């Protein structure tokens, strides 16, 4: 079947080609079976062993090529070394420069250095076309004595054309002159070689310095330039050596030509140039601003406290007291100043609360705050009259009567009623506090007046103080009982905090262990702080009583001013030491609660990662976030604040 099909295919292809040729087309290619046969033969031969053999042969061929390449490089390097060696040998062969010159001129002495130098100079000039015919067949003398009468037919003419930087009168000496080649600038092409005598040049410069008149170079720029030009000689006289060593004195010519003069620097003028109206600039002169010294915050705070105390002392109408205990102002002035007294007391109470709640970092701050508190207590110690105490007690009774009448009329539960009740409660507390403080000041000031006048306290004043203390204690007990009864159960109408405390007490809201521990720590800290303040108050009370005893005993009357100051200093040191000991004992039970919080410049609390990024990394490297990140962060802060401002309900 296969053979018949192949014959039919071959016949069909041949017939097709015959038809295509008759039509004038290109016949089909019949050689398709040959590449298939070759491919089949190659596939048969390409076995695994043949591939390994071919790979080995390729590797051997590559290794041989590498070895041949290395050998070729070694041979090239050897040939290069030999070529360089032969080149060096070729260059070193032959005669040296000294041998060549000696052969050219056998008459020149090898030890004569001057003759050799002149020979070299002549040869270099001959190369440039400007040389002199040096034909020194005789010995070149080291010292030349120049005389015009010695010129003869057999004189050496090697110096013909050279110039001497001296006049004929200077050269006409019997003992002769030693001429040397003058130093010249190698960049100055116009300068020719000159012969000069060193001694004559030095003598000439010395004489010129003596003849020069002193001048002031900073007076004017033009004068300075004229004087500098006068210092430099513009003209010079020289002598030329002619044929057969004949001397020709040349006329004076300019030594420094303006066209050929070369300056290798900048002329600096120390004179301030005058600016005309057209040359004036719009720029202002730079002024150095001195930095002002900034005052520290502590100095400013101290100054503010002192100013407040001075203003209180100046504006207080009760500062001036007569010996009989009456004020120098009448009753109307006292009534007008009642508001001012209340404002002043509120300020003092606020300042005392700030001092009490202040945390002391070290002993220095503690001593400063105690001294400030002592000064404020001394400044606000004023005399309080019995009439004022009675008036304040009467006002307190009227307030209590008003509250009783309001409560008896009935109960009205609304926002206005709650607001008014809260105001009255605060007024009652402030009134009670002011009564207690005034009674304390009254007793203290009465003792002060008695000690100043030298009289003992009267029975009437003692009775008045006892009555006021009894009334104050009674009112305080009543206020405490009312406050305890009111604080037994929080009112729902007060605020959200009262509602939360009520729900917490009833057990509706459960408190977590962490919150309980935090609340317990806060309570322990508050108790510790209260004990600390109570101990300090008791110590101050003992100190005050001790001072009163010393004042009443008459101890200070026998002392001088200096002894009083020393005694007061010792007492202050003793009490300060005692306060420090009490503080140290109290700190044994102190357990600080440390809570580290990171806050950025916008007041936003940060986590540890953000704090490291913004507060440490950016500040250390001195760079911040980009514009896009900063705007995104600000938008997030604004959105967070907007969410917090939304109402709860």
Curated annotation (Swiss-Prot):
Which keywords accompany this UniProt record?
Answer: Coiled coil, mRNA processing, mRNA splicing, Nucleus, Ubl conjugation pathway
Residue ranges with Basic residues bias: 286-303
- Coiled-coil residues: 49-93, 516-583
InterPro entries for this protein: HIND (IPR045347), SNU66/SART1 (IPR005011)
One cellular component term from this protein's GO annotations in UniProt:
nucleus
Q: Which domain of life is it from?
A: Eukaryota
Compartments (UniProt record): Nucleus
Q: Does the keyword Phosphoprotein apply?
A: no
- Return any one Pfam family short name: HIND
- Regions of biased composition (Basic and acidic residues) lie at 29-40
Q: What does this protein do?
A: Required for efficient splicing of pre-mRNA.
Q: What does the subunit comment say? A: Interacts with hub1.
Q: Which family does it belong to?
A: Belongs to the SNU66/SART1 family.
Q: What is this protein called?
A: U4/U6.U5 tri-snRNP-associated protein snu66
Q: What is the lineage of its organism?
A: Eukaryota, Fungi, Dikarya, Ascomycota, Taphrinomycotina
